[in-house]
């Protein structure tokens, strides 16, 4: 048997090494404040912060986009069971009109020159608007047109051009839903077959990434106050990745299937020629354990605003990963995609999606009118 001789002070050296290692880990690992914290249960704002802004007795609006000049855009997708127009503008005098005009909202005609199935809108800092047209006006039927992006000058109210989504990036069951744009790149989520499409706008080329990735696939049911959101036939509504936003600097995108958790991806990986397929699968980070969402938007400072359909709440999440429950109110019946103006207001459609025709065997049970609420955001830091 071999006997190992112990060197003098070996115990001291080991202790010193452990102390040094512990100190190194303390520096390398994030402090507890760096991790995301739980969403507060008590809302910060009182009921008086939420006031009716406008209403519709014919359409279920699922998204709102405030324009810098005080006008407001509303999306009313065909798949929900809405009559036209699918995109409309509320002028400063309170009147409504199809947007950008009646021809682009026509129910028939050349699919390349009209909105077939509105599926997402996003306003850029330069004042131009991008509209996603999925080409799928009925989620239970095949596509009737090739999906496209429509670029609109909101000052002149004219279409600047369109970008067709390449068919090679699509699956037969693809239903595009959700768009975010930074400079010359558009990011589009696929809610029919989970994935994200990256569109180079100048070349009109499209590439597909994260195909059927678990984080983007509907693995959890959409929860509403009464239980699970179901289609009219009783099946749980399974909708893959349909919500997306890009950070103001274009470095990150966040994506989510309505019932899943929020994921974050660094956009540079999409243009990295050396990344392997295996590494690509690992680039997705779970960013927050969100509840079921009806929509989200991002502010110029990177703050995310979420519509929580499980509790009829509006939540926010800062770049420092600080969550806030801004308001909870039963009037926010299935809140949709909110719109942020430049004056500290968030506009939220209470879209009652669970009562729309698509979820009620073709016959809507919506309590009219559908209301868009104005929420005055807090100007103070979150409570500690």
Functional labels for PLM-detected ranges:
Residues 51-85:
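Beta-strand-rich domains and repeat architectures in extracellular enzymes and scaffolds
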Residues 57-68, 110-128, 132, 168-187, ...:
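Beta-rich, blade/repeat-based domains predominating
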Residues 73-104, 140, 153-155:
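Beta-propeller domains
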Residues 74-80, 131-135, 140-142, 188-192, ...:
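Conserved beta-strand positions in repeat-built beta-propeller and related beta-rich domains
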Residues 93-130, 134-138, 142, 161-169:
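Blade-loop segments of beta-propeller domains
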Residues 96-105, 160-165, 207-222, 272-286, ...:
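Beta-propeller fold detector
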Residues 137-138, 142-184:
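Asp-box/WD-like beta-propeller blade repeats and closely related beta-sheet repeat scaffolds
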Residues 155, 201-206, 265-275, 377-380:
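Short loop/turn segments immediately following beta-strands, especially the blade-tip
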């Amino acid at each position: 048997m071999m006997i190992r001789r112990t060197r003098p002070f070996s115990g001291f050296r080991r202790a010193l090494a452990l102390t040094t290692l512990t100190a190194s880990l303390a520096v390398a690992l994030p402090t507890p404040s760096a991790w995301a914290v739980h969403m507060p249960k008590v809302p910060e704002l009182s009921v008086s912060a939420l006031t009716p802004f406008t209403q519709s007795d014919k359409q279920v609006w699922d998204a709102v986009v405030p324009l810098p000049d005080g006008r407001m855009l509303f999306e009313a997708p065909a798949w929900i069971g809405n009559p036209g127009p699918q995109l409309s503008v509320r002028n400063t005098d309170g009147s409504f009109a199809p947007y950008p005009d009646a021809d682009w909202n026509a129910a028939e005609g050349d699919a390349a020159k009209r909105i077939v199935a509105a599926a997402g809108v996003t306003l850029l800092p330069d004042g131009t608007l991008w509209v996603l047209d999925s080409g799928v006006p009925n989620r239970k039927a095949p596509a009737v047109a090739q999906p496209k992006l429509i670029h609109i000058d909101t000052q002149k109210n004219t279409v600047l051009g369109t970008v067709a989504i390449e068919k090679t990036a699509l699956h037969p069951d693809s239903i595009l839903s959700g768009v975010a744009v930074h400079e010359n790149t558009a990011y589009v989520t696929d809610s029919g077959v989970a994935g994200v499409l990256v569109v180079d706008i100048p070349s009109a080329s499209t590439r597909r990434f994260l195909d059927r990735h678990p984080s983007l696939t509907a693995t959890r049911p959409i929860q509403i106050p009464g239980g699970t959101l179901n289609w009219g036939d009783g099946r749980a509504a399974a909708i893959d990745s349909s919500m997306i936003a890009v950070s103001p600097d274009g470095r990150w995108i966040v994506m989510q299937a309505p019932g899943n958790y929020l994921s974050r991806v660094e956009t540079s990986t999409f243009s990295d020629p050396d990344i392997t397929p295996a590494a690509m699968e690992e680039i997705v980070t779970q960013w927050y354990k969100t509840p079921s969402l009806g929509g989200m938007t991002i502010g110029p400072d990177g703050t995310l605003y979420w519509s929580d359909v499980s509790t009829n709440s509006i939540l926010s999440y800062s770049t420092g990963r600080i969550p806030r429950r801004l308001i909870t109110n039963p009037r926010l019946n299935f809140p949709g995609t909110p719109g942020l103006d430049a004056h500290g207001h968030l506009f939220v459609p209470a879209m009652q999606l669970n009562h729309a025709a698509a979820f009620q065997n073709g016959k809507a049970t919506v309590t009219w009118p559908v209301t868009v609420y104005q929420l005055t955001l807090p100007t103070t830091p979150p409570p500690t």
